[in-house]
Amino acid sequence: MSKSSSKLLKVYTRNNLDPAVKESTVKILNQILANLIDLSLLTKQAHWNMRGSNFIAVHEMLDTFRTSLITHLDNVAERAVQIGGTALGTTQTVSTTSQLSAYPVEIHNVQDHLKELADRYGIVANHLRDTIEEIQDPISEDIIHAALEDLDQYLWFLEANIEQDKTTA
């Protein structure tokens, strides 16, 4: 197998996936990687800076989320390299590629953090759901399914902890 001339495929591999499939998959994986890195960092931002009711339960819950996110983003990055791509996980790339809006660093209330996190977990989970049909590599599809399964659960946990206004509930 010869080396690819693709801009995204720079690493030689004996993996025989079609080069076009590799290229489109690496592009999708790198978008997912940027989103997951950003989500893991803002999860820690909330974890460090929250105060209020249910602090310790939410604080500890977010630690488990972040640990899981690190595993998923590592799997995504490694898959991009396994099929001949480059994992683009620098802070510079994440800051320009992530689909998440800037996290409000001035908030401290647990409920405010839960709402901000739920919005962003929803964005990332929905992006995974929307792009999974575009993946033509079964291994990458499995990796995305695993991440989506956890993100949907975490979104549910976040939403379950958001206190509803009694006038609108």
UniProtKB/Swiss-Prot annotation:
One of its GO terms (biological process) is chromosome condensation. Gene3D superfamilies: 1.20.1260.10. It catalyses: 2 Fe(2+) + H2O2 + 2 H(+) = 2 Fe(3+) + 2 H2O. GO terms for molecular function: DNA binding; ferric iron binding; oxidoreductase activity, acting on metal ions. HAMAP family: Dps. Belongs to the Dps family. This is DNA protection during starvation protein. It comes from Acinetobacter baylyi (strain ATCC 33305 / BD413 / ADP1). The gene is dps.
